[in-house]
Regions:
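The DNA-recognition helices of helix-turn-helix-type DNA-binding domains
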Residues: 41, 65, 146-150
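Short pre-active-site segment immediately N-terminal to the catalytic Zn-binding motif
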Residues: 9-26
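Post-HExxH zinc-binding segment in Zn-dependent metallohydrolases
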Residues: 45-87
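Amphipathic alpha-helical oligomerization/scaffolding segments
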Residues: 82-98, 102-106, 110-112, 116-233
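Catalytic zinc-binding patch centered on the HExxH motif and its immediate surroundings
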Residues: 1-8
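Active-site recognition of the HExxH zinc-binding catalytic motif
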Residues: 24-37
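Short, flexible/disordered intra-domain loops and linkers
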Residues: 40-52, 167-170
């Protein structure tokens, strides 16, 4: 448990069977502390803890700290020590993640073919998706995009294939794919992808954007409050 108001980390040792579990949880709570400290440095005393604490930024920092803990031999996730789990993991990776990735690649190619045939027959492809295949359009778009890119390794699994297929440059796709194959978490890879696409805001611009966003939200809430009060008054 992390208490942002007092900056305290509380660990109950009876909740853990091994040191590995204790270290994992300690790193988790320490990540909350670091995120809170960063926000305090940016926003000062005006900082208020967000209700949503497990953000993408949190998981990226958490996984980076876990890597440091592994490098220093404080923590490890050693599935080799559990033969049954190792065998099951290999089965999942080969016969489910990779097999499903291959299947979805082929699915994407078939959707491209169906799109072309719909256009040839003067049939709206969107209607074909909606009422013949009953497939959500966003899902069809993602699957089709995966099928159009041949240099993605199905071994990373379909969800990661979808993410990497949004990268336009093949060399950057290859780098992102290699990161996943080497054990980087998808959320870390996604964050790195975003960093390359975005120019960092300076602190003032960031606060101005937040101010505008909050002002808009307050205006909408005030409008709703006025409506509710008027409705109550007329009852």
């Amino acid at each position: 448990l992390y208490k942002p108001d007092t900056h305290e980390i509380i660990l109950h040792n009876k909740n853990f069977k091994t040191d590995e579990e204790l270290v994992y949880t300690a790193v988790h709570e320490y990540t909350h502390h670091l995120i809170a400290e960063e926000q305090l440095a940016i926003n000062g005393s005006a900082y208020m803890p967000n209700a949503k604490v497990h953000t993408e930024a949190f998981w990226v920092k958490f996984h980076s700290l876990l890597k440091i803990a592994e490098e220093k031999n404080y923590y490890s996730i050693n599935i080799d020590s559990v033969p049954e789990l190792k065998e099951l993991t290999e089965n999942i990776q080969k016969n489910y993640l990779e097999a499903n990735g291959k299947l979805m690649q082929e699915f994407g190619r078939l959707l491209s073919k169906a799109h072309a045939l719909c256009e040839k027959a003067n049939i709206r492809y969107e209607d074909y998706l909606d009422r013949v295949l009953c497939l959500p359009r966003n899902s069809a778009r993602d699957i089709k995009r995966v099928g159009q890119i041949s240099d993605i390794d199905p071994a990373i699994g379909f969800d990661n294939m979808k993410m990497i297929s949004t990268i336009k440059k093949s060399d950057e796709r290859a780098k992102a794919q290699e990161q996943i194959l080497s054990g980087e978490s998808p959320v870390t890879v996604r964050s790195l992808m975003k960093q390359k696409c975005q120019t960092p805001d300076d602190p003032k611009q960031k606060l101005e954007k937040e101010k505008n966003r909050l002002a808009k939200t307050i205006a909408q809430l005030q409008q709703r409050l006025d409506y509710v009060e008027e409705t109550l008054a007329s009852m």
